[in-house]
């Protein structure tokens, strides 16, 4: 990846709770938002928003596996304060709601 895209990825991975919108990230890097959007998509194959959401959902999965935190708290820790939006995104990416996912994981864990 180019240095700019590497910096964006590092910024995203470092703090998922930050405001990670295209305009904010472009401003932090002193580049045009349209340029950043095009470059990020060209180099990663994903839009910036999709990349951020993917990372947030991956973090949510990790927290569902490793903690007993409430879904609302997990959503906040993933940078999505609206639990309904988090649930919608999670279901779109994973195919199950966070609650369903946790229940399946816990049942699987008990069988082992």
Language-model regions, residue ranges each:
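Short helix/strand-capping hinge loops at secondary-structure junctions
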Residues: 15-20, 47-48, 97
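Residues within the alpha-helical elements of helix-turn-helix
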Residues: 28, 77-78, 93
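Short hydrophobic/aromatic patch on the recognition helix
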Residues: 36, 40, 85-86, 90
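C-terminal accessory/binding modules appended to enzymatic or scaffolding proteins
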Residues: 18-33, 37-38, 42
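Terminal helix-turn-helix DNA-binding modules in bacterial transcription factors
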Residues: 10, 14, 42-81, 103-112
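Residues within helix-turn-helix
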Residues: 23, 34, 70-73, 83-84, ...
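…primarily DNA-binding HTH/wHTH and HhH modules…
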Residues: 88-112
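Residue at a beta-strand N-cap/secondary-structure junction
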Residues: 2, 19, 68-69
């Amino acid at each position: 990846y180019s240095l700019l895209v590497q910096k964006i990825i590092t910024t995203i991975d470092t703090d998922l709770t930050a405001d990670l919108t295209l305009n904010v990230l472009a401003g932090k890097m002193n580049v045009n938002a349209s340029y950043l959007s095009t470059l990020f998509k060209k180099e990663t194959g994903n839009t910036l928003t999709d990349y951020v959401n993917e990372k947030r959902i991956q973090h949510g999965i990790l927290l569902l596996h490793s903690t007993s935190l409430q879904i609302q708290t997990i959503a906040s820790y993933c940078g999505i304060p609206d639990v309904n939006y988090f649930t919608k995104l999670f279901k779109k990416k994973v195919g199950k709601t966070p609650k369903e996912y946790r229940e399946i994981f816990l049942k699987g864990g008990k069988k082992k």
